[in-house]
Amino acid sequence: MEEQPQAVDIKAINEKIEKESAFVELLTLEINKVIVGQKHMVERLLIGLLGKGHVLLEGVPGLAKTLAINTLSQAVSGAFSRIQFTPDLLPADVIGTLIYNMKANDFTIKKGPVFANFVLADEINRAPAKVQSALLEAMQEKQVTIGDETFSLDRPFLVMATQNPVEQEGTYPLPEAQVDRFMLKTVIDYPKLEDEQQIVRSNLKGAFEKINPVVSVKEILSAQKSVTEVYMDEKIEKYILDIIFATRYPERYNLDELKPLISFGASPRGSINLATAAKCYAFIKRRGYVIPEDVRAVILDVLRHRIGLTYEAEAENITSEDIINKIVNVIEVP
């Protein structure tokens, strides 16, 4: 006899999430005391934090990327560290190293800047691959080995890496396999005119608002657990899988014209991260269940770095965003 699926009390889940997500508004208001505009970037940082993921931000210098994660760490009363990636950086500069202590005639461990709740990897594409992979391994494993000892990293642990657009000289592009480890890749644009006017005024005054801790690290860890309880219907799961499979086998979804443009589609990590990001987005919107609009809201940030383009696509100036938008327009919404 087949086991009957348990009935889900969506109303109870919704009430619980509505109560537990109340801090999001407080946190956003606190961050907005310093960050003008850039709502999309702040929202994506929160999704990364709640979904235990990491965020890759791409944009020209001077768009408040560093300020955003620093402000978030202050509002959450977490430890913050910044790593400026340069061509001469070594893996030990990121994760830490053993230092010889002459007095004790022994080696002591010096932990690197990766031991913090919020780590800013500034201009990650300016350092060689071995340094990039040292950080990305720490992100994936949530632990670091120095000498013979293995150390767990702090919780919560959010890495926000920034990257200048690849056209700029002196950069080492992140390999596809490494980029795939980022839950989200967000492209940051210039602020609107009225926002920039406000930025200029506040900078000229020189009076910056003090950021107060409004959420504890413990509350964030509890919220990360609550996000997993956000209800996702089977129809939404199927919708996510259809989108992912359409990036791999477009011909199955009457998208034959995309086949010559895609060299590889999104991996299962893409499916997991799309589902997680949709749950986080619902949580931020103080809802205990996922709707198709949640999936569509995060889809570009989750998938833009997971689809490989052929030379043909590049020659025609077709981007991964164009492909995602075509797929979303064709896949039936539940």
What are these regions (language model features)?
Residues 60, 94, 162:
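P-loop (Walker A) phosphate-binding loop of NTP-binding proteins
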Residues 59, 122-123, 134:
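Walker B catalytic acidic pair
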Residues 17-63, 245:
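Pre-Walker A (pre-P-loop) alpha-helix and adjacent loop at the N terminus of AAA/AAA+ ATPase modules
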Residues 13-21, 34, 171-172, 185-257, ...:
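Conserved C-terminal "switch" segment of AAA+ ATPases
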Residues 49-86:
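Walker A/P-loop
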Residues 44-47, 100-120, 149:
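Conserved alpha-helical scaffold flanking the Walker A/P-loop in AAA+ ATPase domains
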Residues 1-17, 250-334:
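C-terminal engagement/docking regions of AAA+ P-loop ATPases
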Residues 101-105, 123, 127, 131, ...:
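Canonical AAA+ ATPase core
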